[in-house]
Regions:
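Non-catalytic helical/linker scaffolds that mediate oligomerization, partner binding
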Residues: 1-460
Length: 460
């Protein structure tokens, strides 16, 4: 059933809570896309999620996040228990490792063998999302001598951010490669690649997809300063962009995030790329049945910016109120959009790629785009685009007259059309892929009468 909401909702799902009833409840509440985070699930667990979702509705698209290239502290040595406490002013050596060396009070090992080479004196290193901070005060060929600026408990495998410094990391890790190949085999629609720094990272993922003949679309997650510095080339090389405000907020001052988000959204809309806003949008609803006013305003601000989608993470993956979180987000979207929900649909046909529907969405028109698709993949990828309602037709029509008659009948299943309703119809070439080739604007009665007469004449 058509749900009057232009802004789409991406909901993260975990394998420990993924029954058919749960998926259906989230979908009925307003979820449009299911996200799976490969950092927190095995391949078997991810397969269970995909199979369950597609049993509920094969039209629900699946997005999987890669873990991406990242820097982490190695495991804390056994003699220190679970953590090592450091105070402001303490000094430690930082060395690169293949991951086998244990971190001690004197030497902090990080899982990038070449890290000493890449980091200069004066650089800041943020550990555990900024809970601890060290600054490089000296450097030798073998190690960095660092001083704690912010102390605290250092635990095993905590993340490390180095703002404004380019680290030589692989574009695709071995785990990423395995999950990308798994995604190809398991009917996934989007890959959200983490910690994208340049177009080179996207091309590395695309090469794997091309080698398998896959149509999976790449969403680039912007999570660090290097990604921001190269945002234009990243947008150009990507299908879409996710503004991942968690890690981005570690590297940038908190007050810089809103303007950064707005600039990325504007660039994506101009480039006709879907854009998703993510991280802690309704985070209090992990434990509370109601969001804070600030969270509602955050969601509303993203919707006012006309983003394609807003995303829920822990709220639906592990929170106590997953369905309520989706319902809340959907209600906010409908409230913000309610002055623009008059159903005067624009019909788009794209038999292969969904490209025309995505381009129409980029204009952020006041009217809903009804996208008639003849392939399930096109229907799924358009489910992420702003204001687009993708409809699957099993029978491909070979001329515009049959298409228009069929489309009007099909639209009546979603919302009754009045004879005086004005429609804009964008259609393709009904042959070799040539993209959209015509636009027609007329009221329902005129379209129906004219094209039914032509179809009847063709049968004679």
């Amino acid at each position: 059933m058509y749900r009057m909401k232009k802004t789409k909702i991406v909901a993260t799902m975990s394998d420990f809570r993924c029954t058919e009833e749960f998926v259906k409840n989230l979908y009925d509440a307003g979820m449009d896309v299911v996200r799976v985070n490969s950092a927190h699930v095995t391949e078997d667990g991810a397969t269970h999620i995909v199979e369950t979702v597609h049993r509920v509705n094969p039209a629900i698209p699946i997005m999987i996040d890669t873990k991406g290239p990242e820097i982490r502290v190695t495991t804390i040595a056994d003699e220190y228990g679970n953590s090592i406490n450091f105070r402001v002013g303490d000094r430690v050596a930082v060395r690169g490792s293949d991951g086998s060396d244990m971190t001690t009070r004197k030497v902090v090992y990080m899982n990038v063998p070449t890290i000493v080479r890449d980091i200069p004196v004066g650089a800041r290193m943020l550990i555990a999302d900024g809970e601890l901070e060290i600054r490089v005060v000296e450097k030798t060929d073998e190690e960095l001598i660092c001083e704690f600026v912010v102390g605290g408990a250092m635990r095993s495998r905590k993340s490390v951010n180095v703002p404004a410094v380019s680290i030589d990391l692989p574009s695709v890790t071995e785990k990423d490669r395995r999950f990308i190949e798994w995604a190809v085999k398991n009917d996934v629609d989007f890959i959200a690649h983490s910690f994208v720094r340049s177009a080179k990272d996207i091309k590395a993922v695309q090469e794997i997809l091309d080698a398998h003949g896959s149509k999976i679309k790449i969403i680039s997650k912007i999570e660090n300063q290097e990604g921001l510095d190269n945002i234009d080339e990243i947008i150009e090389a990507s299908y879409g962009i996710m503004v991942a405000r968690g890690d981005l907020g570690v590297e940038l001052p908190a007050e810089a995030i809103p303007n950064t988000q707005r600039r990325i959204v504007e660039k994506c809309i101009c480039a006709k790329r879907p854009v998703i806003i993510a991280t802690q949008m309704l985070y209090s609803m992990v434990k509370s049945p109601r969001p804070t006013r600030a969270e509602v305003s955050d969601v509303a601000s993203a919707i006012y910016e006309r983003v394609d989608a807003v995303m829920l993470s822990d709220e639906t993956a592990m929170g106590d109120y997953p369905v309520e979180s989706v319902e809340t987000m959907a209600r906010v979207a409908r409230e913000i959009e309610r002055d623009e929900t008059h159903f005067k649909p624009m019909i788009d046909i794209d038999t292969k790629t969904g490209r025309t529907g995505r381009y129409l969405a980029a204009f952020r028109g006041r009217k809903t785009v009804m996208a008639v698709c003849y392939q399930l993949h096109a229907q799924r990828i358009l489910a992420l685009s702003y204001g687009v309602v993708p409809i699957l037709r099993n029978q491909e029509l070979h001329d515009k007259y049959h298409f228009l008659v069929d489309a009007l009948e099909f639209l009546d299943q979603y919302r009754k059309l009045k004879g005086e309703d004005l429609l804009a119809i964008v259609g393709g070439s009904f042959g070799p892929d040539g993209g959209a080739s015509y636009v027609e604007i007329a009221n329902v009665d005129n379209i129906r009468r004219r094209n039914e007469e032509i179809v009847a004449a063709q049968k004679c």
